[in-house]
Amino acid sequence: MSKIRVLSVDDSALMRQIMTEIINSHSDMEMVATAPDPLVARDLIKKFNPDVLTLDVEMPRMDGLDFLEKLMRLRPMPVVMVSSLTGKGSEVTLRALELGAIDFVTKPQLGIREGMLAYSEMIAEKVRTAAKASLAAHKPLSAPTTLKAGPLLSSEKLIAIGASTGGTEAIRHVLQPLPLSSPALLITQHMPPGFTRSFADRLNKLCQIGVKEAEDGERVLPGHAYIAPGDRHMELARSGANYQIKIHDGPAVNRHRPSVDVLFHSVAKQAGRNAVGVILTGMGNDGAAGMLAMRQAGAWTLAQNEASCVVFGMPREAINMGGVCEVVDLSQVSQQMLATISAGQAIRI
C-alpha cells in the first residue's frame, strides 16, 4: 500500500523539522517536502503532488488563510491547519475550516518540541483522516434558507447533536436556518479547550437562535443551542420540572472528552421520546452506542448521509449498530429534525 504523501508549510524551521520527524515516524506516511511560506509551497505542490498539506495559520509573505482560499479554489486538496491556542488563533482556525480545511492541530504554548512529539499519534490520525476525507462534501456551504417559525413547543422537547471531523461547518449549516421557536439543542463537537467558546460566539452571530458554550448547572431553554466546552463532558440532567446542563471532567469515552456518547446516553435517560438525536460527519464510533440508547428510549434519530459527510465514520457506525431511524442529506437535517420534533406530543418523563 502506498504511503500518504505529506507536505508541511510553516515559517518556523523547528516546526518543519518536528513535523517531518512525526510524519516519518509512522510507517504509512512520509514527508515529501517542507516549505517556509506559501509561495514556496505553491511550487512544491506542483512538483510533489502531496496527498495532504499541513499549513501554519500565521506566516509572512502570504497569510495562511489567503493561501488556503486560493488553494481550495484552484487546486482543492486535504489540508490540516496548525494553529496557536490564542483567542485570535481559534477564530482564524474556524475561518479556515469554513474555507475548506479538514481539521486542525493546536501548537502547545510551552515546550513546543516535547508537546508536538507527544501529539504524534493524534497528528498521524488527523493526517490519515484528511487523506480519506471527501473534498466534494467539504466545499464551502452556501447559507441555508431560513425555516418558517412553527408553534412553540413544550420545553420537554429537545434535540441532541454529535459531530467530529467536518462538524463545525455541518453544525453551522444545521443551526443557521432554525427559527426562534426551535426547541433547545445540546451539541457535542470534538474540539479542544479555547475553541468551543469561539465556535459558539461565531454561531451566535450567524444564527437566529442563541448559541453559547454550555455552563454547569444552567437551565436548558428553548430557542437556544448549548455547545459542550472543550475537554469537558456535557450531560443533560433534571432540576425539578426543568432540564439543566451538567458539565464534568469524567474520563475520556471513546478517547474523547467531550464525548457524544456521554451526551446521548444522558438524553436517552432524561428526555426519552421527547428528544431527537442527530449524528453528523466525523471519524470513529463516538455516539453510536448513545444513539442506540436514544432510539431504544423512544427518541427519533437521524444520521447524515455519506454523500454529504466529510468523513462518514460516526454516522456509519451508528447505522451499523442499529441506532438510526433515518439517513438524510445535510441539506435536509434542519427541516427533518424540526418536523419530527414538532409531530409528537411531549411526554413528562
From Swiss-Prot:
Phosphorylated by CheA. Phosphorylation of the N-terminal regulatory domain activates the methylesterase activity. GO terms for molecular function: phosphorelay response regulator activity; protein-glutamate methylesterase activity; protein-glutamine glutaminase activity. Residues 5-122 form the Response regulatory domain. It is found in: Cytoplasm. It is an enzyme of class 3 (hydrolase). Coiled coil: none annotated. Its EC number is 3.1.1.61, 3.5.1.44. This is Protein-glutamate methylesterase/protein-glutamine glutaminase. It comes from Shigella flexneri.
